[in-house]
Amino acid sequence: MKNFLKLNVKEKNIQIADQVIIDETAGEVVIGANTRICHGAVIQGPVVIGANCLIGNYAFIRPGTIISNGVKIGFATEIKNAVIEAEATIGPQCFIADSVVANQAYLGAQVRTSNHRLDQQPVSVRAPEGIIATGCDKLGCYIGQRSRLGVQVIILPGRIISPNTQLGPRVIVERNLPPGTYSLRQELIRTGD
């Protein structure tokens, strides 16, 4: 595939910076037209990256990832076995694993999706019809379309964030959230002189 990419980069207007690693040992890497892969990124197939995407410096795209058209991935973000739908933006230093990020969602810097339970039990999902036992040891979350997540949001395994939801910085998503705006209440206490 590296040879294919090298032969068709100009034709498809794909920009691959120096020191990018495209590893097809485990599967093919497909990159769409007008996509830019920045310095130091690592992509391990099988991976599909759509057209008009930006993969930031030192991003790590791991096997099983599908990135749709018009997606922006920030500096040093790691994505594993996830679906990133069209026009989503994932900020710098995020970790997205075994999850779905829906169309036009925006994730600020250092957002984390947890994908396994500390008690090593399978991840379950709470749905309107009840709890679904997935049988999966690793399962991240679903982030609804046009949702906006602030810096350092953490999402626990199997959680669902409804479309058009806004989460302020440092919110920890411990349960499914209906559409709305959520933020932490913080109390600043001055101590000493």
Features from the language model and the residues they span:
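Short, functionally important structural connectors and interaction interfaces within domains
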Residues: 8, 41, 59, 69-71, ...
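Glycine-rich hexapeptide-repeat left-handed beta-helix
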Residues: 75-76, 81-193
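Extended, small-residue-rich solenoid/repeat segments and analogous flexible loops
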Residues: 1-58
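Short, solvent-exposed loop/turn positions at domain surfaces
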Residues: 23-25, 43, 61, 95, ...
